[in-house]
């Protein structure tokens, strides 16, 4: 899911013109995007470098995007087809994947051109040091966050939000659980 820092969010809720007054109001991609873009425009007031931690695209560090985030469009495609397995994935929900990925990149702690040099440790450090309000990761992330030297995030302020992508009916979506369990094979390789 999306881990968020409740303390930073509470600070945002108190700002004049905040798009929401509580996390309970964020139940769709449309609302998440509205809030993230508003927070990014007010990052100086919030004392953050960006809403989302840097997207770790260093080779070997990109598993959050190639697997964990990819679970969502695959899940919805399987759900539509009422199957548990497919020989071929059409990536019908690629635009939804792009929605959230672009939101992460465009409202980040760093410029998009630097993301190829960022690691998971970098993104979790940014979160731990209070430089961002949100980071995509799992419930195992707390041990990494807590282990960062200079960590400013209290354990009670670490909360989770579903990863919204703009799929119809997502307001009823919960948190993703488990990890990926699929293989993609290029028949041309």
Model regions and ranges:
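Paired acidic/hydrophobic, glycine-rich loop segments that form the ligand-binding mouth/hinge
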Residues: 133-137, 159
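Short glycine- and hydrophobic/aromatic-rich loop-to-beta-strand nucleating segment
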Residues: 1-4, 9, 183-185
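Beta->alpha turn/N-cap motifs
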Residues: 120, 137-142, 179-181
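Extracytoplasmic/periplasmic solute-binding protein
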Residues: 2, 30-86, 132
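Short helix-initiation/N-cap motifs at beta->coil->alpha
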Residues: 26-31, 114-129
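A local structural motif
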Residues: 15-23, 86-90, 105-118, 131, ...
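Extracytoplasmic/periplasmic substrate-recognition and gating elements
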Residues: 149-189
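Glycine-centered hinge/linker elements that transmit conformational signals in sensory
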Residues: 33-38, 76-117
């Amino acid at each position: 899911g999306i881990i968020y820092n409740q303390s930073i969010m509470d600070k945002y809720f108190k700002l004049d013109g905040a798009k929401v007054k509580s996390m309970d109001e964020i139940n769709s991609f449309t609302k998440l995007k509205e809030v993230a873009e508003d927070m990014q425009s007010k990052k100086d007031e919030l004392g953050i470098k960006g809403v989302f931690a840097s997207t770790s695209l260093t080779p070997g560090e990109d598993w959050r995007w190639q697997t964990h985030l990819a679970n969502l469009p695959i899940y919805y495609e399987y759900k539509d087809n009422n199957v548990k397995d497919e020989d071929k994935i059409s990536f019908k929900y690629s635009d939804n994947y792009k929605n959230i990925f672009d939101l992460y990149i465009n409202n980040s702690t760093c410029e998009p051109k630097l993301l190829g040099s960022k690691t998971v440790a970098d993104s979790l450090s940014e979160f731990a040091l209070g430089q961002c309000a949100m980071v995509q990761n799992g419930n195992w992330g707390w041990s990494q966050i807590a282990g960062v030297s200079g960590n400013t995030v209290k354990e009670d302020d670490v909360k989770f939000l579903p990863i919204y992508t703009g799929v119809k009916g997502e307001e009823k979506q919960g948190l993703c659980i488990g990890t990926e369990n699929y293989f993609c094979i290029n028949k041309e390789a």
